[in-house]
């Protein structure tokens, strides 16, 4: 089975093509360009290099959040455009689960660059908790704790101070990865009292191969959705939406593709319309999709 993986939930845009459990090709870029500029050309390059085409795909696995609202929509829009055009099912993959997959087979501490904490005596029987942390701004992170590849509890947006306090009560060993590591590395090193470490640079950020591998597992289990039913998971509402609710502002009118047609829309719709359109009528009928796709 052939699966395309896409992750544009953070600063890195990444796509990968896997066949069964073999990674045929992976392309990641963190070069300061917007994902709308880089993602589709990267996908085209992967198919060109491997001699495959979109029509060969059994499914497209997409990072469905949490993460950058705009980035998530660009990934979803790209996947939906391809899926609608070729009749391919989609697979929703948690961004945090994808990050945890980066280090799922590496044996914990041995895969890391630093280990610290007051309680440094660890044994093979000590539980290793993997904590993907993504910068959610305002001293918060998107995170979840994974034990043996399984989410423990729920994914959440939480203050970094509260997260550190909770982890200190847990014991065991703790591995951190994600784009919030460079932001809060020093804070964690200062405030954690348990054994902890950080993932090595090649595994620190999102990788589409991890998304695709999880997607392959879900495909075999029949866990696919149509383009129409695909949903992104933001965990928390955009700041504009929260401010609107706090101030009691009512919904307002915006224009979509047809300036003569107005409809009531929430701030979510406004952001989607201004940043990147997703779903049916995603705009792909007006864009040039490379012929080799």
Language-model features: locations:
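N-terminal beta-alpha supersecondary unit
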Residues: 1-64, 278, 293
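Stable alpha-helical structural segments in soluble proteins, enriched in small hydrophobic residues
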Residues: 46-50, 85, 103, 208-219
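Surface "functional belts" at beta-alpha junctions
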Residues: 22, 89-205, 234, 257, ...
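Residues at secondary-structure transition points
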Residues: 30-38, 69, 73, 77, ...
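Glycine-rich phosphate-binding/hydrolytic loop that grips phosphoryl groups
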Residues: 201-232
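A short, charged, Gly/Pro-tolerant segment at domain boundaries
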Residues: 228-242
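DPxDG-like acidic metal-binding loop motif
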Residues: 63-95
């Amino acid at each position: 089975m052939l699966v395309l993986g896409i992750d544009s939930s953070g600063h890195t845009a990444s796509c990968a093509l896997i066949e069964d459990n073999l990674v045929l090709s992976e392309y990641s870029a963190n070069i300061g360009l917007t994902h709308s500029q880089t993602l589709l050309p990267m996908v085209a390059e992967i198919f060109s290099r491997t001699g495959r085409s979109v029509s060969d795909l059994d499914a497209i696995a997409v990072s469905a959040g949490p993460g950058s609202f705009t980035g998530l929509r660009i990934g979803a829009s790209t996947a939906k455009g391809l899926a609608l055009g070729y009749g391919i099912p989609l697979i929703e993959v948690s961004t945090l689960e994808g990050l945890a997959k980066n280090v799922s087979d590496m044996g914990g501490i041995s895969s890391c660059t630093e280990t610290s904490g007051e309680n440094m005596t660890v044994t093979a029987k000590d539980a290793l908790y993997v904590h993907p942390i993504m910068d959610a701004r305002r001293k918060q992170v998107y995170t979840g704790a994974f034990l043996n590849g399984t989410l423990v509890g729920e994914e959440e947006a939480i203050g970094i101070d509260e997260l550190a306090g909770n982890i200190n009560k847990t014991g065991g060993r703790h591995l951190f990865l994600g784009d919030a590591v460079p932001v809060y590395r020093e804070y964690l090193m200062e405030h954690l009292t348990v054994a902890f470490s950080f993932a090595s640079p090649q595994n620190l950020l999102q990788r589409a191969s991890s998304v695709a591998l999880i997607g392959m597992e879900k495909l075999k289990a029949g866990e696919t959705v149509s383009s129409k039913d695909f949903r992104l998971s933001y965990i928390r509402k955009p700041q504009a939406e929260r401010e609107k609710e706090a101030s009691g502002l009512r919904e307002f009118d915006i224009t979509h593709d047809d300036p003569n047609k107005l409809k009531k829309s929430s701030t979510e719709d406004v952001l989607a319309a201004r940043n990147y359109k997703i779903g049916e009528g995603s705009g792909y009928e007006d864009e040039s999709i490379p012929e080799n796709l």
